[in-house]
């Protein structure tokens, strides 16, 4: 027991991975008379500081909302824009039924892996956003940095190694980005913001039940 206590309070214990181990090794006693569902839930590795994670995602969503509003006012890129064709070429991550993030077929491990890989895939799009956004640069930078930080928090919580995006896909996107005119840049930025917003909103709902 002493060796476990010593390792738990080493500097490395501040990582999310060891926090999860500590949470499993030292479960909080539940109320008397709890049902089997509560017992099963308590045995799953919980998200570390779930409330803080939710607040962090809401912070990013607030920045996205501000950028979308600015895009709508300055460049008329609003929710009713017809941009489906451009979206098909961007390979923007989405959460689908098979990702097991929806309540009807929820699976924590599968969902957490997909959220993490999705945020990883968004990185090239958010670098583009930061480099090309012509409005509030601080908000654009905040969305990029905050999403990257969220990814860093989630990565060690996965039981399996999270794969990196295919370099061929990244190269194709880079070529597409370089060929865009100003109008198409605005369309692309709007689509990135909208897709990231949807992805984070679904992720937020999933994290609430983890």
From Swiss-Prot:
Pfam families recorded: IL6
InterPro entries per UniProt: 4_helix_cytokine-like_core, IL-6-like, IL-6/GCSF/MGF, IL6/GCSF/MGF_CS
Localization: Secreted
Cysteines joined through disulfide linkages: 72-78, 101-111
List of residues that carry Phosphoserine: 81
GO molecular function, one term: identical protein binding
One GO cellular component, as annotated: interleukin-6 receptor complex
Record bears the keyword Manganese: no
UniProt protein name: Interleukin-6
Organism: Mustela putorius furo (European domestic ferret)
Lineage per the UniProt record: Eukaryota, Metazoa, Chordata, Craniata, Vertebrata
């Amino acid at each position: 027991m002493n060796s476990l206590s010593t390792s738990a309070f080493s500097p490395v214990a501040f990582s999310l991975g060891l926090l999860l181990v500590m949470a499993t090794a030292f479960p909080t006693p539940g109320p008397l008379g709890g049902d089997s569902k509560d017992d099963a839930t308590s045995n799953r590795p919980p998200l570390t500081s779930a409330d803080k994670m939710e607040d962090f995602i809401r912070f990013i969503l607030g920045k996205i909302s501000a950028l979308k509003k600015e895009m709508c006012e300055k460049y008329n890129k609003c929710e009713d824009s017809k941009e489906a064709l451009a979206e098909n070429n961007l390979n923007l991550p989405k959460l689908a039924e098979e990702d097991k993030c929806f309540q009807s077929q929820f699976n924590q491990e599968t969902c957490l892996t997909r959220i993490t890989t999705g945020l990883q895939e968004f990185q090239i799009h958010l670098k583009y956003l930061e480099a090309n956004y012509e409005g509030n640069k601080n908000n654009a930078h905040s969305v990029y940095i905050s999403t990257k930080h969220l990814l860093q928090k989630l990565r060690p919580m996965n039981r399996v190694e999270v794969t990196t995006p295919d370099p061929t896909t990244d190269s194709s996107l880079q070529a597409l980005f370089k060929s865009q005119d100003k109008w198409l840049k605005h369309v692309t930025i709007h689509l990135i913001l909208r897709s990231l917003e949807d992805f984070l909103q679904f992720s937020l709902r999933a994290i609430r039940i983890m």
